[in-house]
């Protein structure tokens, strides 16, 4: 990262954190964390969708491209007929999924959110209510965001039960949420500039950086409790640099928000890893997390980075319910909760993971160690 890009990130972090911090007066840190990170995720998928949309528009109008739409077949260039056909073609889902871009329906697109957040309750919205031929009616901004999250999940099965849909239930003031949306809208993640200079950063890289920064800030705000889902980047980087996970299966049995996976992918990119479909694509990640909200944070983190993942399909206690019983990983890395006292149950007595003997019932440290060894491939590292 060059000095200009570093300054861009520093200014961006300060700007967005200042905007998000306005919610602290009315929400606990553990709650507003999910509000802000959920909006960042929605901004990411919408920006990625818009990037692909702009790319497609140029391809439709390029005579040299396979997707070219000849104006002569649609009433001529610049005619309403031609523009309508371009617009219709831009709504074809396959153009996006072929590039591993999430399909974002109209009601979940960022510009729609920004504009509709200003509409008074009871007024019509620019889409029909689900299953009806009548326009949906505006309620609150929290409901508007929940509706967007539900729409993204509905259209992208990979994200099912991943996104936070509790904006309305937290009863956050609509004006504060609308202001936060406006602040995020004010930043162009797709075409970043700094001091008049256009930067070569992609929206995925920018939002991934912002997501990581916010996770760290929220962990600090929550104190000791924040350490349950966030391992400091310096520690994560050290472990990844030691193990050097260039390719293969990477497993974290206490994954928190997924920091080890993100750093593994960054390690490959920094050391000349081949790029496939916009990502290095040389590792497959497996993880487990017992806290449902933290599990969602990790899944969103992977989606923002474009990483395929297997988190067992649901949250789960790793020691009590191993969701990857047959996994033998090439790299195992973790920062498990140390000195857990209340972890044992009778069903664990003859568990096959205890390859060196049954661990002490009053402390889970040796249970974690044996669990990790059990899931390590014969030639693996941990």
Q: What residue spans do the PLM features occupy?
A:
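Conserved S-adenosyl-L-methionine
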Residues: 225-334, 339-343, 350
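Generic recognition of stable, solvent-exposed alpha-helical segments in well-folded globular domains
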Residues: 7, 11-18, 40, 205, ...
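Hydrophobic alpha-helical scaffolding
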Residues: 2, 170, 200, 254, ...
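Non-catalytic, mostly N-terminal accessory regions of nucleic-acid modification and defense proteins
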Residues: 1-246, 310-323
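Mobile active-site "lid"/loop adjacent to the S-adenosyl-L-methionine
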Residues: 338-367, 379-381
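Conserved Class I SAM-dependent methyltransferase catalytic core
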Residues: 15, 22, 31-44, 239, ...
């Amino acid at each position: 990262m060059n000095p200009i890009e570093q300054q861009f990130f520093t200014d961006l972090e300060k700007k967005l954190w200042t905007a998000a911090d306005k919610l602290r007066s009315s929400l606990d840190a553990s709650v507003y964390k999910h509000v802000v990170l959920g909006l960042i995720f929605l901004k990411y998928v919408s920006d990625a969708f818009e990037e692909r949309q702009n790319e497609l528009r140029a391809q439709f109008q390029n005579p040299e491209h396979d997707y070219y739409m000849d104006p002569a077949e649609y009433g001529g260039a610049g005619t309403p007929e031609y523009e309508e056909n371009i617009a219709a073609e831009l709504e074809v889902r396959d153009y996006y999924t072929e590039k591993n871009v999430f399909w974002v329906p109209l009601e979940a697109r960022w510009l729609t959110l920004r504009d509709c957040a200003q509409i008074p309750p009871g007024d019509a919205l620019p889409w029909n209510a689900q299953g009806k031929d009548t326009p949906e009616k505006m309620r609150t901004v929290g409901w508007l965001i929940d509706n967007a999250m539900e729409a993204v999940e509905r259209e992208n099965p990979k994200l099912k039960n991943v996104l936070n849909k509790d904006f309305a239930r937290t009863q956050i003031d609509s004006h504060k949420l609308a202001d936060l949306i406006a602040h995020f809208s004010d930043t162009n993640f797709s075409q970043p500039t700094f001091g008049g200079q256009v930067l070569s950063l992609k929206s995925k890289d920018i939002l991934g950086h912002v997501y990581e920064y916010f996770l760290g800030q929220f962990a600090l705000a929550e104190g000791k409790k924040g350490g349950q889902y966030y391992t400091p980047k310096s520690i994560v980087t050290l472990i990844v640099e030691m193990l050097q996970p260039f390719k293969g299966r990477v497993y974290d049995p206490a994954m928190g928000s997924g920091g080890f996976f993100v750093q593994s992918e960054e390690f490959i990119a920094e050391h000349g890893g081949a790029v496939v479909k916009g990502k290095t694509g040389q590792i497959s990640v497996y993880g487990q997390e017992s806290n449902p909200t933290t599990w969602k944070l990790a899944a969103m983190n992977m989606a923002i980075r474009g990483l395929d993942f297997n988190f067992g399909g649901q949250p789960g206690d790793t020691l009590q319910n191993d969701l990857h019983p047959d996994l033998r990983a090439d790299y195992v890395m973790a920062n498990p909760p140390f000195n857990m006292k209340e972890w044992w149950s009778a069903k664990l007595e003859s568990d096959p993971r205890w390859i060196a003997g049954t661990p002490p019932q009053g402390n889970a440290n040796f249970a974690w160690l044996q669990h990790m060894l059990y899931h390590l491939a014969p030639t693996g590292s941990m």
